[in-house]
Swiss-Prot record:
The gene is SSN2. Residues 415-445, 682-720 have a biased composition (Acidic residues). This is Mediator of RNA polymerase II transcription subunit 13. GO terms for cellular component: mediator complex. Keywords: Activator, Nucleus, Repressor, Transcription, Transcription regulation. The lineage of its organism: Eukaryota, Fungi, Dikarya, Ascomycota, Saccharomycotina. Residues 551-568 have a biased composition (Low complexity). It comes from Candida albicans (strain SC5314 / ATCC MYA-2876).
Amino acid sequence: MVGANASSISTQYYKLAHLGSISYTIYTSSDNNDQALLELELTIRHKWPQILVTYYNKSLYYFVFGHNKVDSETIDLTKEFPQLSTKYTDTVNVDQFPNPHKSTKNDDNLAWASLSFLKATKKMILYNLSLSGAIKLFGNYCVAPTGDSVYSILCIDPILFQNGDLVVSCVEKPFTQLFSSSVAYPRNLAIDTNFVIYLIPSGIRCHLFDPTSLRNNLIEKPQIENGKLLELLKITTGVQCDESTLWVKLIPNLKHLNNQTSAIGKFIHSVENKKFILWPWDLCLLQFGKFEPAIEEEGLLESSELNNPLHLISDFLDFRIAHNTQLQQQRDSLSDQQQGETVNVPLSAGSVHATGANSFGNVPDISKDVDTVGLSTTTPIETDLFNLQNTEEFFKNDSIHMNLEDQIHKKETEPENESENDMEIDDLFGGDESDDNDDLEEAGNEEEKPTPSNNTIDKNGVIGNALEEAFIADATPSKENINLDSKIMPPDSTSEEAVPDKENFKPKETKPSYIDILKDKMTIEKIVNSPDYKDPGAPLPVVPTPLVSSTVSQSAVTTNPPSVGSAPGPAPGPAPGTETLYEANNAYAQSSQISQLPQQKSAFSPILFNPIIKSDIDTKYGKGGKFYVAKDSSTNGNLDMKNRSLRATSVSGMEIPFSSEDKKRLQQNLEVLDSSTTSDNEGGEDIEDDDNDYEDEGDDDEEEEGEEEEEEESDEDEISDIGKSTPLKLNTQNESVPPQQSNYNPVNITDSGSNTTNNITDKQGYENTEGFGTPFPNQISKYSIKPESPFASNELQSSVSPMYFDTSQSHQSPQLQPSTGTLEVLKASSLESPSKISESSNYLPLILRSINVSTIPSSYLMNNLISSKLLPSFTISDDDLENDLDITKSNEMIVKLGFLKEFLDFMSPNIIFDLGLMKNDESDYYINGVNDLLLNSDPGISSDWILNSLSKVFPCTYPMKLIELLYDFKSLELEDQLDSQLNFLNEIADEEDFVGPKALYRKLKALEWDSFSLNESNKTSFEKYKNVMEKLSAENTVSDDDYFKLPMVKTRILKNGNIVNLNNIGLKFWKYLNFSPVKKQKDFQILLIAETHRNTASYATEFLDQIIQNYKECNFGTISKVNLSTVETRSDLEPISDGLVLVHKEHDQSYNDFYIQTNKKLISLVELIKLDLINKTNNFEFGKPLLLFFIDFNDSSNSNVQVCKIFRNFKVALTTHQLPLVDIFTKIVPSSLLVKKVHHETALKVFSNYKLTKISMNLYNECPNDLANKSIVKNLFTTIVKDPPSKIQFKFMNSSYRDNSSNDDIFLHLAYERSIDNSWFVASWSDPLGRVVHVKSWYCSDSVSKSEKSTYRGDIMDIMSITDDIWSISTDLFKVLNDELGSFGGKKFLVLTRINSIIPDVELVHWKRLSSKHKEISLIVVSVRQTPRIVGSNESEDLGPKSNDYAPTPMIQDKDIFFGFKQTFSTSNTSSPSASGGALVTSPNSLSLHSPQQFLNAPANFLSPQDLIAPTSSGISGAKPGSSGIDPEVVLENQDNEVYGVIPKVPLPSFNSPTRFCMKTGYLMMQVNQPSEEEYKDDIKKTYLVYEINLLSCSNYWNLDVLMKLIMSQYKQMIALNDILCMNPIVGESDILGTHSRNNAIVPWHINAVGKLLDYLVHIYVDKD
């Protein structure tokens, strides 16, 4: 019956062919062009989809099956492609391909061909499935749909067995969900910052070029010659891409390009790479981060911020900003009423003296300049020192096609308080100068008379005032603002009339700003001849850099058009930008006017600091602090003429030619101003004249040379070029409003800017994510080339092909430049096609590079995306102890590197041994409508879907059953003499009559077929093969050594002073049966930490009393409460009474403040302990460990991080106060387990004895052993019973381990895993019996400096130090086990288990080093997955009456008979049968219980008199199944504990190394019931959990079958340890008793522990500063 069961269980394997021989041909390129071979492979596969061809080792391999070669189906590639030449050809039997090194032929070509064959088969399968639309190619595998726009990663690997079977393994990557790009646009179900992008088909991760808004990166119909890219995508994926598709501007992640994963703790981050590509938006997949909303209420933050002085200042500044904005609006309205003459204002700059207001309008598609807040493309996330709240206003994304007037009107109607969130920017970086004006100044501004300088005519004045009004409170204007109006204005549109009118207005004297950052002072000179600063070593401050407003980075000026209209500003001036512009050219500089300027000095220096800077202040960060100084400044004294021309602040870095002749030309063009403000001249003359504004800044040397040449050209051509240029010689190639002759068409978005940034500021977790986007926002189609480029500027947009483009090194200028090689290609191609620029092949790696999908995390959180450096919470009594609790504002998971080792020591046990209450993996915090997509999606990729998809493309495909893996083909191939003599019977008898297994196998082997060539012979052979296989499955029997049930696990307990062996179900009745631990009792002190509000402290006292009483009744020991008093001299210390530390928390108080208060109380506790020691009051028991029991009411994921920080600080304080004798252990329990909270009232739940006993068991396990003999091992309350020896070992006999291991051998299991971002390392140790259990984690780095090693004392370690530490711990644990067993003759085996991967080389080299050094320890290397797979079966469930979880054995006997076990395994030989039958159980008094086993088997209602049906003599109740009959021979057993072992006879590859066969593979199987559907279906199919174990290496004296069976038996024991170690959920107390906990029921505890802890640690960001 076992065979019948195995023949119905499905596997992940699907058979595609049965082969006899394979012919292969190796081709090389005639002209040694390896890249041509690579491209030729794609062409061949596209032309013949079913062909088996691949490029490998600089050759092209072509394979043909032997049975197809006779059919003339081979293709002569040399005739089709003359550039190919044949290198080698051969035909080999199929049994030589899987193991070419063991073949008789000593042929190197065969070794390469065997690897190439699997690659060619995999590519062919994936390509055909993609061609059919079933899957999408993704990385080294593919993705398959599981719902509407939801995909899961499907790993497809072909395998060739030695018997000729070609099968394909199809396994879903668990817990990884990807979404279609249509979810973000056009469906707009989530905001723009909570996802990462992966390319199809390569799987490379990319970043948005403009991270502030997805829509700024989308382009429709770009003017590029993208045919080559689309054609390459078509022949690679089989998917036709339309040229009119939507394109997106992306930056590839170079780290992921090298198969490395970014830090998961801050997975959405900035990148230093400044190269971008254009990619079809349809060929992108999104992975959304999990967002955890902040639990604080609105009033909560307001209350907490009042305690911070900086917040008080911020509130005050916000008030001043709003007040000054109102005054400014009143002044503007007055100016509009008195509007008279038209006065033109410069297009190039805002007010020089205004700090907040500027002359730039709110134009469509605004992309704020990140540099204005000190962020740059290379600025890492942790360097953002300020929590900038104003993401919505600071990075505003307006509609592209909205009219300017509509935008202005919309801006006017917006609430004025929108600018209040700009506090940090304005105040920390210069802000609005009106903030610094006092009331007198404001009154003076209101009383001033309007002059022609203040007014414009008609629509221009309205627009100008509105634009000024819109940005009066915003310190960061957009780059696109300048570009847009540069398109609007013709080049000669600046009026001269503004200059003489400036005398009519004299600005008021303003007092210095108290928060005036260096931004203004370093780039804008208030007084040319400054007497305050004289430094002979510095360049002379004769020429300021007064191009733009102090709040506008000069990159914004250089890349964006100026606004139009008047610029009243807080410090009014007629045309301040024009004034300084002409001063710079010495055309209208007047000392009298200059003397009118107020002298403002920086708050940081009493003198004015006026260096000559190459660009604005932010450039110094991008260029490494390079301050531009002319090379001839030290030798040539004539600096006026050399430096009169404005320096390089434009994108191109070109100097702007300007001369005195500008005056006349500007006067002549005064009348043009009105018409130029419209958008009708978008394709104006300025575009045509800006061809030379581009330069290549690929490296610093070229950049400096270009700057020298530009200076010379600027000096020579000042006069001649002025008429052809705008006042600023800008790169006016605007991507927001393109020239009319260009076909560049961004996505037509009509939403307002507020809708574009819909929910960015609504979530706490996204307050600062906009700064992470690296290259600058909204520069979609611009890059620079050298001035001698032959391209016109309107043609440059067409050159944005899907290749790498490099941006400028200047971080405020978002121009992009191609690499040198790319530039040469562009120049060459431009000669051939002046209208379009052909593509480069630089994007080939983005298509052909297959990224390993294992580098993609299953999930990542958005918690840490605010900033790693937040405003600290200052208090008057700030502790000297370094504390990182204040760097957390909301729900960030950030910890400092200092004392990280202690932090992890507290974190590990609280995460792992959590009573199953951790729900991090079960919580999906997706944003907005993504949750709806998940609800409509399937839980995974079903086997039926896989079979249907394969069958549509490859009709001759069928799923393999488990029994096919259990065939011993070697035994079937052996023929004895009797079989050879009776061969004539095969000819006499019919096929149906003779069904011997060997004869059937011979017939099976003779049939050759495949699913790739659809001819009649293949179909006929396939049908015959299936019929023979069905007969063979029915005829062949399975050995019990290959398919068996693992024995029951029993535990050791103490009952009345005697050791009793009991199955683990008896542990659930620990208190009822008065059991005791085998080890000695553990006593400790307890300190319960809880929050209180009003009168809610009673629950803590009640729970503490209950747990102390239960712990004692369970015979675990005694718990004493901590009571500490203070002394009169330390009245600041609060005494501790009754073991309680109650921290008051108001409902509007943040948990961060609560944690800080708790931390202070525990630090005070340390001082109380020290006072108790000094005063010798002996209230504190130093001989007992101290338990810190924390009741956690915070449901956020970061609560464990924060609480463990408190524990770490307490431990560090004990060391600081020289109290090493205090041994502490901790426990964090969620409040949901203990209390019920309704509104503001908190009450203790009613506990069952079972729940309290589980908590007591957990505390006993965690309590350290005797303090006198400290050890890393902590005794458990019970251990597993060791299996009795199967045979007697005689040591004087030379017996080997091939058949069995010695009873004295010591096995220690070590499971470990390293996170995919290589930042965390977790290991756990366990022996099979639970005598030693240990877990440890490390923060890992590939390279650790000597200073870090000495400073952080092992807080950060490299892989070599970690492996040494692991080996040292393993050696210590072997010593403990050796002392426990008292054996000296056995060997030591370390079962090294690598989770989720084979051992990589960087780890393998250290394990080899350590194992060769320590010969006494023998390594057994195993590879496993963290999670099991779910497989189906053709069997139907027995839909009988539902039974309880724990049923007597008679309920299971049908199952045992089904599996073919002749004798029951659950009968007890210790219990005595009762002859009185059911009459004895009619009342409690008549029930005789002679053993605990009988008590467990008593019915649930045995205490109530009622009639029961007596059991029959056979021991099985005569009642219906499910009735509560009693039989002393029946043992209570949990059905979930039934685990079966399967050892396939066929060698199989590892799940993560498909080309390498394991030494042995084994499967643990457990039947599970799928929930929720059983009530509605009549025919429920059985489902099994399958856990795969791969044996990779061991000593050669082992019998592999015996060793695998031994490992599986030990795994079964360690599965039972999950419950003993309190890792499983408490029944009825957890809301996650779903799929996740059910699936982990078959995983051993040490593997569960590693995965559980690592899944949490990867989301923690470590601050190394």
